[in-house]
Amino acid sequence: MEAEFSRDGISLRRYQVADIPLLYEAVRESISDISPWMPWCHSDYSMEDSKAWVISRDEAWVNEVELSFVITDAQTGAFLGAVGLNQFNRDHQFANLGYWVRRSRARGGAATTATLLTARFGLRTLGLQRIEILAAVGNRASQRVAEKVGAKKEGVLRNRLSLHGLPHDAMMYSLIAADLNV
């Protein structure tokens, strides 16, 4: 299964052991931006957390539990963030798509391009019928990414996310093959 893609100066690839310190650096740089929406990103995030995550990616991929990609600058190879498909529903052929981009590269289009590439991979290569993107109601940056790739806003799901132990409403977006001409 193809696992590397590029478009508009952005590349996606699977995690490698060499990404451990790069992931750590990107997360530490971005805690204040990402932490409200992704509880795994917290002030105590450590190099060991990065190592555990990167090491777990191969097994998650093989078992098709979560297909995770590193977002890189296609020219320099710089680590920009991550994107992936998870929460697969095999009976109904859909999955969740999530993403984050490091603070120093936010608002540069990396998340949008990575989301588009990953959605196409899910719909075309994996044969999914639907990709879902959930964004906390207060997470406008994530909502903008979903809207830029053409995801359809389906509404607010009450108490759909648990962030830092508290329930939060989420905006539900979806993509199907027709939305992306796949």
Regions from the language model: what does each represent?
Residues 56-57, 121:
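A generic secondary-structure signal
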Residues 42-45, 58, 66, 105:
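Intrinsically disordered, low-complexity regulatory segments enriched
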Residues 37, 41, 64-68, 129:
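Short, polar/charged, Gly/Pro-enriched helix-capping and turn/loop motifs at alpha-helix termini
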Residues 45-46, 61, 180:
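A short hydrophobic/aromatic micro-motif that marks alpha-helical segments and, especially, helix-coil
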Residues 59-64, 151:
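Short loop/turn motifs at secondary-structure junctions and domain boundaries
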Residues 35-56:
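Conserved GNAT-fold acetyl-CoA-binding loop/helix
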Residues 1-22, 26-33, 68-182:
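Acyl-donor (CoA/ACP) binding surface of acyl/acetyltransferases
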